[in-house]
Amino acid sequence: MCVLKSRRKGFSFKGGSMMCRNYYLIPASKSYVYAANKQYLTDDGILTKAWDYMDFIDKHTAWGKKRSVNTAMRKRAGFISKDEYGNEVELGYKSEIIGVTLKDNPDVVRGKKANLILFEEAGSCKELAAAWQIARPSVEIDGVAFAPMIAFGTGGDEDSNFATLKDMFYNPEGYNCLGLPNIWDETPTDKECGFFCP
């Protein structure tokens, strides 16, 4: 799905909640969020919001989970125990939320089977076109999606970075995205577009 939006619409909160839903309710799930810069993930970014949700859920609800990995870019539900032979083994839910920065290298998305993939601040990501196509096999079998992949963002600071998100919006079928009737453009058209949040 391609989402073109204006600023301050809460999509980092929405994305964080989607990842937490998988983390707490789907064992061994993997939710990835990709961004061009680490600051879009951390600081006041989507992962920080997800971690705040997790801290609240762990403290105030019955769904709390221990974390076998607990870093600024990755959380994994689980714990280490010893088996009858004294070997350390990981037990628990084993669901994960993982943040990855593209850093001018769209190949970092390759080979990651996922239950959810988000592209944060996609309008500022010059690697979006290549990364999207490379990531598609992570959520598709023979062109049929078994998990959602969502790119959302606003126009970037540089026109060239926004070009791919704009193309995805006006040509959703070319990216295997959900197409919706285009009721937003001044000139009526029967072509479909991505999701728009004014």
Question: Where is each model-derived feature located?
Answer:
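Phosphate/NTP-binding elements of NTP-utilizing enzymes
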Residues: 1-198
